Amino acid sequence: MMLPMTLCRMSWMLLSCLMFLSWVEGEESQKKLPSSRITCPQGSVAYGSYCYSLILIPQTWSNAELSCQMHFSGHLAFLLSTGEITFVSSLVKNSLTAYQYIWIGLHDPSHGTLPNGSGWKWSSSNVLTFYNWERNPSIAADRGYCAVLSQKSGFQKWRDFNCENELPYICKFKV
């Protein structure tokens, strides 16, 4: 039979563990929600610790990337999770854009010379560890070396596209 003091200590430890776990779980779920902790410039929206701005003035991929760097000290959006893609998708859909494609920061500077599509990189230099292709770019007949979100996929999947086309784009930046 346990002594009352031992039982009390065990109850306290269990309560402490449960409180810690709920705090950790709460922290994790907060990372996935749009953040109200940061204030973005007018016309931009916060998600996590970044601001996102959808620019509807069409540019080539290179000019769009330069624009994100010059105006926001950021990059074309680099999408690292399904939660982030869902957020960006809703941002694009809510803009009522008539465009079928939106530039993101993914590109293949090797122009397909590396095997198995391994040349694809984020313009921000973030490591490409999450893949969400609408179609495999390394076997497409009409290859492009810059990536877009496509309306066909609900702006949730990536597709390779000709970098010289002029399209709207999404910038991602910190404030």
From Swiss-Prot:
SS bond partners: C40-C51, C68-C171, C146-C163
Keyword Disulfide bond recorded: yes
Record keywords: Disulfide bond, Lectin, Secreted, Signal
Main location: secreted
SMART domains on file: CLECT
C-type lectin domain mapped to chain residues: 38-175
GO molecular function, one term: carbohydrate binding
GO cellular component: extracellular region
Induction, per UniProt: Found 1 and 2 days after cellophane wrapping, absent by the 6th day. This period coincides with islet neogenesis.
Reported tissue expression: Expressed only in CW animals pancreas and to a lesser extent in duodenum. In pancreas it is found in acinar cells, but not in islets.
Localisation: Secreted
Superkingdom of this protein's organism: Eukaryota
Keyword Translocase belongs to the record: no
Signal sequence, renumbered to the chain: 1-26
Function: Constituent of ilotropin, which is a partially purified preparation of cellophane wrapping (CW) pancreata. Capable of initiating duct cell proliferation, a prerequisite for islet neogenesis.
Stated name of the protein: Pancreatic beta cell growth factor
Organism: Mesocricetus auratus
Recorded name of the encoding gene: INGAP
